[in-house]
Amino acid sequence: MKARKTLMSLCLLLALPLAAQQKNYVSEVWVADQGNGKYKNPVLYADYSDPDACRVGDDYYMTSSSFNCLPGLQILHSKDLVNWTIIGAAVPYALSPIETPERPEHGNRVWAPAIRHHNGEFYIFWGDPDQGAFMVKAKDPKGPWTEPVLVKPGKGIIDTCPLWDEDGKVYMVHAYAGSRAELKSVITICELNAEATKAITPSRIVFDGHEAHQTCEGPKFYKRNGYYYIFHPAGGVPTGWQVVLRSKNVYGPYEWKTVLAQGNSPVNGPHQGAWVDTPTGEDWFFHFQDVGAYGRLVHLQPMKWVNDWPVIGIDKDGDGCGEPVMTYKKPNVGKTYPICTPQESDEFDGYTLSPQWQWHANINEKWAYYAGDQSIVRLYSYPV
């Protein structure tokens, strides 16, 4: 029996994001790698909201908002930025009392994570809009990951990202959710302790987007050529654009530039994402596109630096602001790797769920019966 994800979405089980269960699975529906040295967008045709990524050697790792779905913070792996598989999850279950683990809380919990690698360890920071900024870490991205640490408590803190500076100081940038904090459209920075487990200074607003960049959010923190850079979207999820802030001082003042917008492309509101580079010296940018019921799809854009400003996508008129590409040459990572895509079906021939499946709350033994010998998963109605 081959069952599609839609069969299980009728109950508490959620099938997005999709994952790879077997090696080099290739979708019959959507393949980004065109097999001719080019790729097409989106590179991930599934709901990976607020993606972030980092490179460690020849390997790339990505995570995204999982909200209330568990296992949360699924970890994807790629060798070439185009072909991806799921290798694990950083938050296998929700913890009490930080969470309400046995009841679905749609849209809550894990918002806009940032994944980083520092001194041999992987870190993931995220904001829980009702609790504050959290962090987990691991030596191996496949796990095990530590239990979440509340780095900075505060209602409305979202979209957190750390930065380890050359002088040993650690900073965290974040935004605010207006629905909880009664403030939005600002970017703030605080300093963390050396272990990156606790904020040691109050947050300071370094950018106010109310005039030119309403709904600025999703900041990602980088440093290059002596400049501190904050990449962030503005203008709203389905209709916005990408802005970059830069300053020689971590607390500013920051100057800004719009570096990516829809333009004449069909890619509405290119939203928050991640800057990554390749071992060969190329620069690339991930972002998502909101397409309503289909979710938030991940796109990959070429990127270059001009006068210490990033230009993302294709800058057709030379004004420093690019527009998204739909097809482009694949990143040069020095090698060619096999085509693979996240899995989108399941034979259910085991006695546990494959890693592409998620629940809306901690698993309850009353919810499902696994009969791998019959290729069956039977779901039960359950009041919540």
Where are these regions (language model features)?
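Carbohydrate-active catalytic/glycan-binding domains of CAZyme proteins
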Residues: Q21-V384
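Bacterial N-terminal signal peptides that target proteins for export
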Residues: M1-L10
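Hydrophobic h-region of N-terminal signal peptides that target proteins for export
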Residues: C11-A20
